[in-house]
Amino acid sequence: MATTVKVLAKELKRTAPDLLEQLKAAGIEKGSEDDSITEKDKTVLLEHLQKEHGSAETGARKKITLIKRENSEIRQADSAGRTRTVQVEVRKKRVLVKRSDEAAALEVEEAPAKVIAPTEPVKSILSAEELEKRAAEATRQAELLARQEAEMKAAEEARQKEVAAPVVEKEEKPVDNAPDAAATAAEKKATADKAAKDLAATKEKELADIRVRRAAAEAEALAIRDMMSAPARVLKAPSEIAAEEAKKGTLHKPAKPEGADDKKKAVAKVGGKTIKSAETSSTWQEEGAKKPGGLKTRGDSSGGVGGWRSGGGRKKQRQIAEANVDTNFQVPTEPVVRDVHVPETITVAELAHAMAVKSAEVIKLLMGMGQMVTINQVLDQDTAMIIVEEMGHTAHAAKLDDPDLDLGTDGHDAELLPRPPVVTVMGHVDHGKTSLLDKIRAAKVATGEAGGITQHIGAYHVETPRGMITFLDTPGHEAFTAMRARGAKATDIVILVVAADDGVMPQTKEAIHHALAGGVPIVVAINKIDKPEANSERVKTELVAEQVVPEEYGGDVPFIPVSAKTGEGIDALLENVLLQAEILELKAAKDAPAQGLVIEARLDKGKGPVATILVQSGTLKRGDMLLAGSTYGRVRAMLDENGKPCNEAGPSIPVEIQGLGDVPAAGESVQVVPDERKAREIALFRQGKFRDVKLAKQQAFKLETMMENMEEGAVEAKLLPVIIKADVQGSQEALAQSLMKLSTPEVKVQIVHAGVGGITETDVNLAVASKAVIFGFNSRADAAARKLAENNGVDIRYHNIIYDAVDEVKLALSGMLTPDKKEEITGLVEIRQVFLVSKVGAIAGCLVVDGIVKRTSSVRLLRDNVVIWTGELDSLKRFKDDAKEVRAGVECGLSLKGYNDIKEGDQLEVFEVTEVARSL
């Protein structure tokens, strides 16, 4: 409702014409008393009336009053020795006066004749109001002195005129008696001159005194103005003052908190009397000039904090001092989110300590998840990370070997230099691999190194015009597969040897799968091109089917035709290998502790454990302490590829060493450690705590646990990796095609390797690396493969009928499918009456109309046949007893979990959600 002039005049108890005149005077044009008045018009009218009566404020607030209260406790011991606590409240008040800009502009600043200023910084102990008064007084004194000086100058000029006037008159009079008149005139003139000189000297002295006083007054006024215009220290917050004082503390004597700053103050001697200095808190400096020192306590400088007595020795005094220290502690208002690094295994107590919570909280959460644990229970990494996430913290997977964290750090600052490539020659045994290696050795190894290849080391290097190449001649592919299964990459480039007259064979495909899975570049050497039946184009076509595309077909794999018999193409093959090495930019540190890999190891009856080491970075020297997996030892002897002793080996150089305490496993990483103590510590750590972790890593996926190991809710399709070995090529191809047809957009069959023949150790190692299941169709595993599969937990399935194999894979894929959820309505409940119970909420008295109601069932709340809420039951009772279920026709009482908006006449629809397994 708008306010009119008439209504406003009635509220102000004035007549409407008078109010119209006042509005007109304020610049508000209103024609009649029925015109409306806005809030803006009222504000303008109020300002006009205040200005007219002289009560309007022309500026902002000029004074700000600060009131500070400090509460403290004083502990004193009475005559009986008992300590009592006295509550003390100190109130401090301060008024800040803000100077107006107009007053500051009107002040006339004159350069002083002589500036009398203190050499030290001026420390104000006066209030702003007192300083302003003093500045005004100094200005008035300067003006008064200037006026007095002007008046004295005018009086002096007038007096000189009066002295000179009688002399002139006497000169004008007629001279009756010339001698007497002349003598009298001379005497009077001398007297007048002397009086004038005395008066002038007196006036000059007075003027000099006035000038000195004026200069002093102006200097004082200037100093006061500088003090007032300087930045006020009182605007600094107490927390900032405490922070600055804390920075001045030392390690052994920290800075004193703000609450205890009155214990030690500077003491000055003035006239033999001890007084407090003005070095108090800068916020309350004015009170230091107005009030006397602290409490008088018989010479106690602590202001009475210590009481009348000593307080029971140093311990008591220390407790009193600690009680009065202000720690500035602030209770956190938000939950603290911590970054928790979770290792492979961790106990409940260690996990609680990492999250800074009590162990009972972690145990309670685990009990809610269905696990009964104690504080010493060991949790795996996945469970521990779930606990950390549930408690609102951020979980990070820690590194596996904590003692190994500092290994290899010595070589980080070393210069990285180019190293020779490590090349593995792979292929079918009948395709001339050994002949090709012999040809390379005979062509590139110096005559001084003549002789057969040292078979027990299985590795050597050759020199070419463009650099050196290290070859690994391991028997079969077991070592290469084992290395990839352990996460190591010992090989940089793979030379795939394929016979031009035989084409791609099963072992050739296996080698391709190994290389592609390890991400190692391939150089194809088409051997036996000197034979009449050689067909290089057929080999290229077959390799394209295995995802090995030559460069002339648009791929990235170089194909080099060679002949191990005539030596044709050997130089081109080595040239392409070095070209691939340049593309990879292989570098390693030379002046650093050696790191490498175990190529193969054996137990010699005369030498003990012997291991072939490939140095990957650094330099291995004789006498170094070497750590290989869980075994260690000092290098007692070192042999090169020709069986000759050597003292050191650089990057990409294979050597055979002696001195380890046990035979290491093939593929284990080796590291030079500083001393034996460090090596023993890490070896024992790996043998003990991580034995279970190692076994867990070696567990392959089994058909029975496939659904548990797969990630739930993954967007990408789930894969079932399999390895197929059959008796004949036709059966292997038929089985592979039948299994591939089972793939759907949700689950797919991934054939890691399919071959012909028995199941070998190579197949088991490949299954460990790819977590695959091995299917043997009319083929069996040998003794070594069975033992390796049993140790690593690889699942091997034997079948004689192809349909049985297809049905088993189909069943496994069905288990990997996400189950469907189906709802089934089990009952209907009608709410007859609603009771409100404090601390519980709304309780519904119900009648089961149809079906059955269970305590664990889910419900929907229906109001006028419209679903308004879906949830669970909080409680279900029959009379006063808890009930697990209530059937149709029986009354019961129930409450809903987290919902109280229920009314009489509502209905509850009871349903259960069941999971239905899907099938292909």
UniProtKB/Swiss-Prot annotation:
GTP binds at residues 427-434, 473-477, 527-530. InterPro entries: DNA-bd_dom_put_sf, EF-G-like_DII, EFTu-like_2, IF2_assoc_dom_bac, IF2_II, IF2_N, P-loop_NTPase, Small_GTP-bd. The lineage of its organism: Bacteria, Pseudomonadati, Pseudomonadota, Betaproteobacteria, Burkholderiales. This is Translation initiation factor IF-2. Residues 563-565 are annotated as: G5. Residues 301-311 have a biased composition (Gly residues). GO terms for molecular function: GTP binding; GTPase activity; guanosine tetraphosphate binding; translation initiation factor activity. Residues 427-434 are annotated as: G1. It is found in: Cytoplasm. It comes from the Bacteria. The keyword Ligase does not apply. It comes from Polynucleobacter asymbioticus (strain DSM 18221 / CIP 109841 / QLW-P1DMWA-1). The gene is infB. One of its GO terms (cellular component) is cytosol. One of the essential components for the initiation of protein synthesis. Protects formylmethionyl-tRNA from spontaneous hydrolysis and promotes its binding to the 30S ribosomal subunits. Also involved in the hydrolysis of GTP during the formation of the 70S ribosomal complex. Residues 149-197, 245-319 are annotated as: Disordered.
